[in-house]
């Protein structure tokens, strides 16, 4: 009985006792915090960046042999191409393709004068798909273009949209009319020069009549 009363009093006193949160107070440092923020030296940062980039380039080029490095510098310095560039084992692939194209074109720039229409391009691709044994030289001879132009046509997979196709067809119509007008002028000049019967005014009149007829019937 006495023990039960004592335990009840102990529980009651523990419940009624208020909870006190004791926090440990830490003294602040006597040092003052720096209020001024110092900007970094941008000049030194740029110099460090340039030095790093230069160092990386040197490391990249250091993978080449001494003879290959000299040959690569000579190739980059001018349009001349070394005869032994194929023997360079460390030459990048894009360089090999570039030199092979220059060698194939015999130093001339890639600028084909003759343009093929979109229908002709699609016809060449269709023939190549149906008859894979046909070579680029065969198509070049048939369509009177360079073999490199045929290779580029067969390699490309670009297809125009409906709007782009309409614009291409419109350009080809204008190009055809202009080409026909030039042919007519050349034929007129040749005829007048051979016969010598028409005067300058008559020649201009005939040219204008042919041009009007082409514009009406285009």
UniProtKB/Swiss-Prot annotation:
Residues 1-28 form a transit peptide. It is found in: Mitochondrion. The keyword Metal-binding does not apply. It comes from the Eukaryota. GO terms for cellular component: mitochondrion; nucleus. Keywords: Mitochondrion, Transit peptide. InterPro entries: NGRN/Rrg9 (IPR010487). The keyword Mitochondrion applies. Pfam families: Neugrin. PANTHER family: NEUGRIN (PTHR13475:SF3). Required for respiratory activity and maintenance and expression of the mitochondrial genome. Belongs to the RRG9 family. This is Required for respiratory growth protein 9, mitochondrial. It comes from Komagataella phaffii (strain GS115 / ATCC 20864). The lineage of its organism: Eukaryota, Fungi, Dikarya, Ascomycota, Saccharomycotina. The gene is RRG9.
